[in-house]
Amino acid sequence: MCIDIVGKKILLIGNGFDLAHGLPTSYKDFLDFCKMVRELYTYPIIDNEYNQKKLIDWNTDKTIKSKLLECYENRKNCFEDKITTQCKELDELYDCIKENVWINYFLEREKYIGENWIDFESEISNVVQAIETLKGYIERDEDVLKIKDTKQQTIIYFLKIAKKSLQDVFNLKRIDSFIEDISIELDKLIRSLEIYICEFVNEIDINKENDDIKTITPDYVLSFNYSNTYERIYGQSKKVTYDYIHGKADIKNNVDTCNLVLGIDEYLEDDKNDKLEFIAFKKFYQRIYKSTDSTYMKWVEQIKKYPEVNHNLFIFGHSLDKTDRDILKLLICNDNVTTKIYYYRKNKNDKKELGKLIKNLVRIMGQDELISRTMGEHKTIEFIPQTVFVAKNN
């Protein structure tokens, strides 16, 4: 029996997709939101005018500000022992962040860290690797003061933020307990991000769209985002198969059921199958443990099974960072896949973002393969400047 296999169009989107549509989804946006929420729940009643002005002057979307201002009014009129805003989702979010060691750490380190989620993940990785080094010294009964300066500084700084001393974690039982505690704190941070996406970001009215995206009409959308932005703007009336590879934000979840993936890349080589104390921080583990969608693997299987069938991959708003190397290579590095990578530019001569994408592709596939796929006789990769966003037609 002859089966007619038709090539597919796959759209791959990253956080740059949401940012390009004016949504406050950067790591800094989320951290600023957490700061504002903390102040909302902790300010003295006599300072209410000052805090209201801070909310009004805050440079963020008006939808978020109006929701927090409403919560502010409820908080101002609350005289119960337990502080609430009559918004149970925001109350839950505050419970997750109020004494969260990771939030505290990032607020303290804010001016030293970039604004992207990659910078956020890199900082977590630095802390994890430093604490893993500390545990190794404790296991071998070695002098922890001989740990390299950079890691030693990270350890001491993070312990200070966690209101701990070296003595508090200076045996195997204590440090294992500490590792478990900061893993739970990361879970709380992830849940607070889920609430932020569901209750605030997804409620923002998006008033612009992009012709590049509109004309693609994909069969599949592979989203590295937690939000439903593409579905809301472009996918309402189309038969599209979605794969939210890092999970899709759902307000019905809680800390235990939240399936969003936010972690670090594997940094070990020879010991990666033996040193498992920090496995819960790693993306591959979270994807398995949280049962995130892996429908994209079926697409890859079809691509490889029928090499004579040509497919089209469109990438928009993804940095092509090496942390997603395994997935990107499976899709891009196929002779029957034509890849179009859209990049942002401020003007016709601006190639800053293009340069970053090229560097990241070298890290993913190596120079030789990148050259053959962009300049060879049978090139499969093309870089395309994004068209200007226009007002959305309602």
What is each PLM-predicted segment?
Residues I13, D29-D32, D243, G247-K248:
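Conserved beta-strand -> loop -> alpha-helix junction used to position metal-binding or nucleic-acid-contacting
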Residues D271-F281, W299-I303, K329-L331:
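A glycine-rich, aromatic-flanked flexible loop/lid motif
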Residues H21-G22, E231:
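Short N-terminal helix/helix-N-cap motif within the alpha/beta-hydrolase-1
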Residues I288-W299, S319-K322:
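A general structural motif
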Residues I46-S291:
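Extended, H/D-rich, highly charged conserved domains that either
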Residues M1-H21, Y27-F30, V37, N48, ...:
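SIR2/sirtuin-family catalytic core signature
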Residues E39-T42:
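Extreme N-terminus nucleophile/cap motif
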Residues C34, E110, I233-Y234, L331, ...:
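Generic structural signal for hydrophobic core residues of well-folded globular domains
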